Amino acid sequence: MAKLSKKAKAIAAAVDKNKLYTVAEAIALVREYATSKFDETIELAVNLGVDPRHADQMVRGVVTLPKGTGKNVRVGVFARGPKAEEAKAAGAEVVGAEDLMEAIQGGSIDFDRCIATPDMMGVVGRLGKILGPKGMMPNPKLGTVTMNVADAVKAAKGGQVEYRVDRTGIIHSGIGKASFSAEDIRANFDALIDALLKAKPAGAKGRYVKKVAISSTMGPGVSIDIADLPAAA
């Protein structure tokens, strides 16, 4: 069995795996032990009391993190004519139509978020098997199939993140960087939790929020006391 490094031992001693921390305590611990040479992402994991195999228990949506994500989000847009120019002016890195489809089919996906005008969905639909598994397929319910491409591009770059429960009932989402202040991480934490509470499906039974944990990319997971969340949780 590999020996623990001094850093790992210090972290193990500082974070009690059997303890539930307040949100403020958890954020402080995660920031303190995010000591890698790169700016680690602060990640939130929320275990929900839903069974996503049932359509009436799916939890999915978008939320704008008020303090941003700390990431440079590259945006790809399927559009033609004036809408293509609008997307470029708004800051989209990749804009195209059939040419963009062919590039993606060839293995080139040079963006993090994908937006399309409604008239382009016939083209985008051919990419379902490629974009779908990556969570990049444009969706009108998420505001990524729209004629308001400028607003959609700006939202994607301005801190908007998509969330979707996985097959085990857990939502995973980045809520900032270790370089963020504790206050900024808390603001983003609150925004995402609020969005998840509002997205509670009618089919959910029993306790909705079962477990919450926060961590950094290379750091330990810190469990949060659900009693420290809004009453609706």
Curated annotation (Swiss-Prot):
Keyword Transit peptide: no
A GO MF term: rRNA binding
Keyword field contains tRNA-binding: yes
PROSITE patterns, sorted: RIBOSOMAL_L1
Single GO biological process annotation from the record: regulation of translation
Keyword vocabulary terms for this entry: Repressor, Ribonucleoprotein, Ribosomal protein, RNA-binding, rRNA-binding, Translation regulation, tRNA-binding
NCBIfam families in the cross-refs: rplA_bact
HAMAP family, alphabetized: Ribosomal_uL1_B (MF_01318_B)
Name of the featured protein: Large ribosomal subunit protein uL1
Gene that encodes it: rplA
